[in-house]
Amino acid sequence: PMKVTSIKSKLDVRYYKINPENKDIQLLLHLLFSDQTMLTYIDPYKENRYKNFCHMMMNVEEVPFDSYPEYERSTLNTLVNLGCIRIDDDGMVRVVDQFDFTLYKLLYDYGVIPSYFMYANNTGKIDVLLDKGWVLPSDNLLTPKEQDYYSYYLDNERFDDGPAYRNRYAHANKVKTSDDEKGHKYAYYRMLLLLMILLLRIED
């Protein structure tokens, strides 16, 4: 039998997923969306408590480069080299393309960019990301994060601390009738939920 995590979509490309081997996209997403960087902690914006650098730039649109201390400017230059911000002649830091930030947000939140999203927007942006090696095409039905979710609940292939319901219930001799009834009920509802999600993904 085929594992749920291996089911293919009928589409040649269902998602564009983060290339786990590419360090540039990993660094870019960290600098844009991590709340652990200090890129938002500058006057006069630090009192606004922006979640991350992307959140700040989407709200203020431009910040003075010289408002950053010297040790943070190299980080900004890294983002310049990665092509997501620019430093103009007037000394202001600005976003190169706001739509790019939308794509980066999808990658950060979900790990993928749906192919239908790119078709609907009809841009060549995805080709740029592919050429840079930042994303890879995928024909899987489930995204990598969804695959992890299913693997956690169904087997011990990717995790060693999950319920592994498939492993447990596929072999009746491993299920004791004396087991907690609430536990069986919870497992039953959880597997129903997993089935519903899978059906929705197929319908989608």
Placement of each model-derived feature along the sequence:
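Flexible secondary-structure boundary motifs
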Residues: 103-155
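A short, conserved structural fragment
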Residues: 76-90
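A short mid-domain helix/strand-loop element embedded in enzyme catalytic domains
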Residues: 26-59
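Helix-boundary capping/turn motifs
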Residues: 45-55, 74-75, 142, 157-165
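Short helix-coil junctions and helix-kink-helix linkers
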Residues: 55-69
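Accessory beta->alpha helical hairpin/"wing" motif in late/C-terminal subdomains of nucleic-acid enzymes
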Residues: 88-115, 167
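Preference for solvent-exposed, low-hydrophobicity sequence contexts
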Residues: 1-35
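Charge-enriched, short contiguous segments at helix-coil
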Residues: 148-204
